[in-house]
Amino acid sequence: MEESNPAPTSCTSKGKHSKVSDLISHFEGGSVLSSYIDLQKDSTMNLNIPQTLGQPGLTSSPPRKFLPQHSPQKQENDPDQTQGQHGCLANGVVAAQNQMECEDEKETTLSPEMAIQTAAASPDTHVLNGERNETITDSASSIANSHDENASDSSCRTPGTDLGLPSKEGEPGMDAELQERENGVNTMGLDTLDQHHEVKETNEQKLHKIATELLLTERAYVSRLDLLDQVFYCKLLEEANRGSFPAEMVNKIFSNISSINAFHSKFLLPELEKRMQEWETTPRIGDILQKLAPFLKMYGEYVKGFDNAVELVKTMTERVPQFKSVTEEIQKQKICGSLTLQHHMLEPIQRIPRYEMLLKDYLKKLSPDSPDWNDAKKSLEIISTAASHSNSAIRKMENLKKLLEIYEMLGEEEDIVNPSNELIKEGQILKLAARNTSAQERYLFLFNNMLLYCVPRFSLVGSKFTVRTRVGIDGMKIVETHNEEYPHTFQISGKERTLELQASSEQDKEEWIKALQESIDAFHQRHETFRNAIAKENDIPLEVSTAELGKRAPRWIRDNEVTMCMKCKESFNALTRRRHHCRACGHVVCWKCSDYKAQLEYDGGRLNKVCKDCYQIISGFTDSEEKKRRGILEIESAEVSGNSEVCSFLQYMEKSKPWQKIWCVIPKQDPLVLYMYGAPQDVRAQATIPLLGYVVDDMPKSADLPHSFKLTQSKSVHSFAADNEELKQKWLKIILLAVTGETPDGPSEHLATLNNLPGPKKKSEC
């Protein structure tokens, strides 16, 4: 863009004198704009030109905001004229267009006329506190026209350079940038003063707002009291006088609600109404509250009987149809807001803490020197005492509301709505099934005196859960179990039932154990029989002791842990010999061994299916038949696995039969015999292999499974396969000793006995 040629000095001087004279003659009458020019004149008297022109950040005092006297009618003038007017910045800052004018005026001081000229050069826009306000007037437009008429030569100026300012077209962003800089400095002092003035006004306004809020909430509260007293109470009393139910029940529910309503509607509310009308002359509320606060003691009677009143409403609604009909009819009305009677009964309980909160806020805004300070402080002390009782009742009511929600979630089948019941924790959890290895979704509700073990109910409407078991806190014990296949597990052992549960995470598990422990400890503290609830895994046996049979729910042995009846040792199958659990000891038995019933104390004395042994212990009947002497196969797997040279699952194949997974054990007490079980908890071995004399082949063929080995003797061939090479070598180490009659501890007694036999019998050796 081409730069404008500098204007001659004579033209510039002539333009200045004509403009100054026009401005003085035009604003001699003292308009709003002239006062603004005077302000600019005072602020620029001591400023020199180099400081003003060279440093845009240094400006005069902030200009005052003024309104135009006339509507902007000449804003759509010739663009060239308007553009020249817009080139001036707010607050009297002038930027030189070219170096010649700056050098001519470097040593001159800014005169009042120059300040007037600067302020009037751009009357259309001013930036004040970050806001741009239009200030174009008819008078201001005439100034521009007069300026143009007095210019003798058009060559003395170019568009946008009336006062030596840079052209807008040349540097379009410079104007806005300079305005932002000077506004940041000029408005600082003004903002500080405004903020101080605003804070002073805000405290007074907030005191008025608090008093207004107290009045408005008091009006709404009185309308709720009228609903309780004049609608619910009167309608139910009318129905009671008809003989539908005793009137005494209605009086117990509403207590002294009529007295409370009379106090607020006839005394407190009228006093507040009158005071707010006189607020300009008497801006205080502490004296009213201090005078009437002692009457709030009448709430003590209402709060004291609140729990029983809510429980009575629930009972009457369930058992008396007329009571239910009247309350439901009122609750349908618009004035109730679709809220229940219990909800409206909570209003007086919540009102006292509301007074306390508003009064505390009022004292924070009130100056200690105020005449209302002492009255407000005394009234707060009285109200705080009453509020402490209300807060306790509110907590109980909130807990009761939660109990009602749970009551509905359970299909209104469990009687849990009782003020003595307190919800401690709830949440989803997984239950490890005894009949299979699956984890089933469950939901727990932990209260201060019981645990509800629930099953989710999949329905669009109605209840969400079904209570499967209610386990009492009394006698409950917790065990933190460790299961590699199922992490984050723990066991709840109660008189009614034992549950093995799996949490979603270790943190969730710890939270449940902590909540259960605290509930158990608190329960025993209330009954003065404190004892630790969390015990180590070894502190609680997996099986119920003989003394506790029928008194404590057992832990059920999982179906996949056994393959045969734990009493008669017969193998299970899906058709003729299915699995059953003894409800007394938790063992898995067949139908023959569970064909007994006994009364179990933990199940309320009801008859339950039990095994033969438990039946004899619980009922006291003894079997005269002597127990059979156990054979070699009748050694329990758990008995030998705990004291063995080696034990693990192995794949096993005999002759042309398919591979099957079995539990193999070489016990320390019989190290030359390999016991094979269907599962680790089986009480009887499926087969045994005396290892002495067998040939070991640890080089499997290509058709065999990896990590396999064979035991061969005559026509008997037993094939085994381990899960990995390490486990295979562990087995081979023990078996290679056993086939030669040796043990890890030394020569076997079996081999010594064999060597002492007569000659002919030594043919059995390999």
Curated annotation (Swiss-Prot):
Q: Name one Pfam family in it.
A: FYVE
Q: Which tissues carry this protein?
A: Detected in thymus, lung, heart, skeletal muscle, small intestine, liver, kidney, spleen and testis. Expressed in all parts of the brain and in the spinal cord at embryonic, postnatal, and adult stages. Levels of expression are lower in postnatal and adult tissues than in embryonic tissues.
Q: Which UniProt keywords apply?
A: Actin-binding, Cell projection, Cytoplasm, Cytoskeleton, Guanine-nucleotide releasing factor, Metal-binding, Phosphoprotein, Repeat, Zinc, Zinc-finger
| GO molecular function annotations of the record | actin binding; guanyl-nucleotide exchange factor activity; zinc ion binding
Binding sites annotated in the UniProt record for Zn(2+) 2: C582, C585, C611, C614
Spell out the residue ranges making up region: Actin filament-binding.
1-150
Q: Where along the chain is composition biased (Polar residues)?
A: 47-62, 70-85
> Which compartment or compartments is the protein found in?
Cytoplasm, Cytoskeleton; Cell projection, Filopodium
Q: Which residues form the FYVE-type zinc fingers?
A: 559-619
Disordered: annotated span: 47-86, 143-173, 746-766
Where is the PH domain positioned along the sequence? 422-521, 643-740
Residues modified as Phosphoserine are: S702, S716
Subunit (UniProt): Homooligomer.
Function of the protein: Activates CDC42, a member of the Ras-like family of Rho- and Rac proteins, by exchanging bound GDP for free GTP. Activates MAPK8. Plays a role in regulating the actin cytoskeleton and cell shape. Promotes the formation of lamellipodia.
About its domains, the entry says: The part of the protein spanning the actin filament-binding domain together with the DH domain and the first PH domain is necessary and sufficient for microspike formation. Activation of MAPK8 requires the presence of all domains with the exception of the actin filament-binding domain.
The protein's name in its UniProt record:
FYVE, RhoGEF and PH domain-containing protein 4
- What is the originating organism of this protein? Mus musculus
Gene name in the database record: Fgd4
